[in-house]
Amino acid sequence: GRAIMAAMAAGTYPRPCITEMGGKNPCLVTENADLDRAASGLVRSAYGMGGQKCSAVSRLYVHERVADDLLARIGKQLDAIRIGDPTKRENWLGPVVNARAHQSYARYVGELRSWGAKLLHGGRVLTDGDFGRGFYVEPVLAEAPGEHPLWKHEMFLPILMAQRYRDRDEAMRHANDTDMGLTAGFYGSAAEVPWFQENVEAGVTYANRAQGATTGAWPGYQPFGGWK
């Protein structure tokens, strides 16, 4: 993103540009959340466009009382996803952008497993049949230990890491424990929304949104940003 901005500013006249600068976006789910709404928003935000967007959610912090239920609902939606040629309407998830992303996916899955993460869904690079004509992967949902380095690394892939919590202030500390502050999402009661908005460190926030946990703005029409 910075290289593009520098190139656009280097000519005789400045030229407008839209750049993707990165994000490591969290979503918090409390025990008071509408879990169907949360599951739909998380799936759309984490896996839409293959997770290859700066606003995609990649970190999920869910209250231990509802964690099993929410993760099961996410898994059920992932089971129903059709992967394939994105020009065909029946397919929801297309390929990742290139061979490098394909290789990165396999490496990140290996790193998750080596640290003892529990892969609840996905983890395979798809190469059989028509999948051999592109860079296809399965969407990943993984419960990972809090010390895993990938919690702070932007993967830019359809990978959602989840962690359970007991205390919401503890969850907020985890959510804010990153150098990036682009977007953040929340699912809980209406009474909890002000607490989320006042404490989360992100430029763009969404609360109880089924259409996308941390996504919504459309680049070029609705510029957005956030930093620390």
Positions of PLM-derived features:
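Conserved C-terminal structural/oligomerization subdomain of aldehyde/semialdehyde dehydrogenase
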Residues: L28, R82, G132-K228
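ALDH superfamily catalytic-core signature
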Residues: G1-G146, R168-D169, R173-H174, A207
